[in-house]
Design a protein with these regions (language model features):
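Juxtamembrane interface at the cytosolic side of transmembrane helices
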Residues: 2-3, 9-26, 196-240, 247, ...
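Juxtamembrane amphipathic/hinge helix adjacent to a transmembrane helix
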Residues: 6-12, 169-187, 203-215, 372-394
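Polytopic transmembrane helical bundles with strong interfacial aromatic enrichment
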Residues: 34-35, 41-44, 341-344, 348, ...
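N-terminal membrane-insertion alpha helix
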Residues: 39-59, 241-261
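Membrane-proximal N-terminal soluble sensing/regulatory segments of transmembrane proteins
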Residues: 52-125, 256-328
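Polar/charged, Q/E/K-enriched amphipathic alpha-helical segments with strong coiled-coil propensity
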Residues: 120-191, 323-375, 393
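Membrane-interface helix-start motif
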Residues: 184-199, 389-404
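Mature extracytoplasmic or organellar-lumen-exposed domains after removal of signal/transit peptides
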Residues: 268-271, 277, 281, 312-317, ...
Length: 430
């Protein structure tokens, strides 16, 4: 009935939108919805940043480190096996022990990376490593056996083993390391990304401005200066925005430091260590072959150039705690390169006895001693940079502790404050 519908529209519980009570109801609904929507967006954004920070610190970085160490252990095992052969039928026990330790470490790191489930992207590389590592160790064992018996076939087995390492195992290990390092880079980039954070903070400011404008409008209509509910909502919003801004900016600064002065220089130094191992392997294989093979010498020069470039880059990237070790590594590398030139002259003169002593001897000026000190300096620098990453990443990840729940509770408090404050005004019209 028309009259009945008109009467219903005039009921106090259903004020028209053009009236003050009707506008208050619309404002209340809009503010509550805006607060809840912003709270959901803020909680989602913070959750993504916190999850990415945890991914970088607790998962990606350890796996990247394991893949890096696996590569280094494999390369060092090959160098150690080759160097031990040069000592004759009874190489020092320390070399045998170091070789076994490298193989055990590489196997353990391979298991750790495989257990993490790298997926199809590196599945083939992991399968190659698992299948071919026993093949490599078999060649080395055969070479060492023949060498201990005085048979010349030992060097052939070691050369085949080295080919297996450089053509199959190390490329597969490099693929695994590149994949895990890319995951670490992606997680760090997501944890330090700004676009969604800026949108969320801007949305919070917009909601806060809407609450402020509603307070002004209500004050003019009701001639009351303050609305307690809206005031509480404003306070909750301010706390949420300040907390988020401080956590995001502080956490981002820590995570950027973890990357810039931790994982990035550590990766550069790891690549330098790999180049050093490559050069040392070429140096010893040149002695084993005793053919004056220019390929080994050319490969040594290539690795030498890579090592020099990487050490120069690391010197500008590393944290202060690693600077001394990086400088020492550059000094040892330069001395090693100079000794290698002397060894090449002895090689050309066919003075293999003096060349062997210069390359594998442990006198203070020998290539062996310089390489050992270079490895120690690189290891110390890598550990120092990794410690910077661990400390800074932990601080960056910790900045998000409790923030997801805190933002959600504060957003609910904002919505409740708006609903309560405006409901009190509506009650005055009934």
């Amino acid at each position: 009935v028309p009259g009945h519908r008109a009467a219903r529209r005039r009921r106090p519980g259903f004020p028209r939108a053009s009236t003050t009570p009707g506008k208050v109801r619309l404002i209340r609904a809009g503010l509550v919805a805006a607060c809840l929507a912003w709270g959901a967006l803020a909680a989602l954004m913070v959750s993504q940043h916190a999850s990415a920070a945890r991914e970088a610190t607790a998962t990606s970085e350890p796996l990247s480190l394991a893949a890096q160490q696996m590569y280094q252990s494999l390369a060092d095992a090959d160098v150690t096996a080759s160097t031990g052969y040069l000592y004759g039928r009874t190489p020092p026990f320390a070399y045998r022990q170091r070789y076994q330790r490298d193989i055990a470490a590489a196997s353990a790191d391979l298991k750790a990376v495989t257990a993490a489930g790298g997926g199809p992207a590196i599945g083939a590389s992991l399968s190659t490593l698992a299948a071919d590592l026993p093949v490599y160790t078999g060649y080395v064992e055969d070479g060492q056996t023949y060498n201990s018996l005085g048979y010349p076939a030992g060097d052939s087995f070691l050369e085949v083993a080295s080919e297996e390492m450089h053509l199959t195992l190390l490329p597969a290990a490099r693929d695994v390391y590149a994949y895990e390092n890319a995951r670490l880079t992606a997680a760090s980039a997501q944890a330090t990304g700004l676009p969604l954070a800026v949108v969320t903070l801007a949305g919070g400011l917009a909601v806060g401005f809407a609450i402020y404008r509603s307070q002004r409008w209500l004050s003019r209509r009701t001639h009351r200066t303050l609305n307690v509910g809206l005031l509480l909502a404003s306070a909750a919003g301010a706390v949420a925005l300040i907390w988020m801004a401080v956590a995001l900016l502080g956490g981002r600064a820590d995570l950027l430091r973890a990357t810039g002065h931790g994982s990035t220089p550590a990766e550069t130094l790891a690549q330098a260590d790999i180049a050093a191992l490559q050069a040392r392997g070429d140096e010893t294989l040149n002695l084993i072959s005793r053919t004056g093979d220019t390929d080994f010498q050319a490969d040594f020069r290539t690795a030498q150039d890579q090592l020099s470039t990487l050490l120069s880059s690391a010197e500008g990237q590393s944290a202060a705690s690693a600077a001394g070790s990086v400088t020492a590594a550059r000094r040892e590398a330069s001395s090693w390169f100079a000794v290698n030139q002397q060894a090449q002259k002895l090689d050309q003169a066919h003075d293999y006895g003096a060349e062997t002593q210069l390359v594998i001897g442990q006198g203070s000026g020998s290539a062996g001693a310089l390489f050992t000190r270079l490895e120690a300096d690189l290891d110390a620098a890598i550990r120092a940079d990794q410690a910077v990453f661990a400390a800074s990443a932990a601080a960056g990840s910790g900045a998000f502790t409790g923030l997801v729940a805190g933002v959600a509770v504060l957003a609910l408090a904002m919505a409740a404050g708006c609903a309560w404050g405006l409901s009190r005004r509506l009650a005055e019209y009934r």
